[in-house]
């Protein structure tokens, strides 16, 4: 996939969206029902706690073909920043821009960057965060 991004940098925004789908910053979010409602045949009473697991919804087999495969051509639909409305992440545009610039600059400077070990994750049920990501940079691109 790295080579495809180098050959066609127009795919970088797709890589950003697919990364956000597969690796959202937060694993879940909890809300309190403000009124009685029904969701997918399940009654939810006012005051009950409801948890939305981003890591599950973003890999829902009924919604995504091969949900555990990173696919640069996948349609950009995910809940990494919420589902809109009052509880939508205000930092969405900045987060996307930061990821886009990071990918553009890293791939331009180090086109042979590669994974050099197993990523270590922070042990948390709430945040989806890396503790370490071993990589080899390879030789810098010619200036």
Identify the role of each PLM range.
Residues 1-143:
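Cytochrome P450
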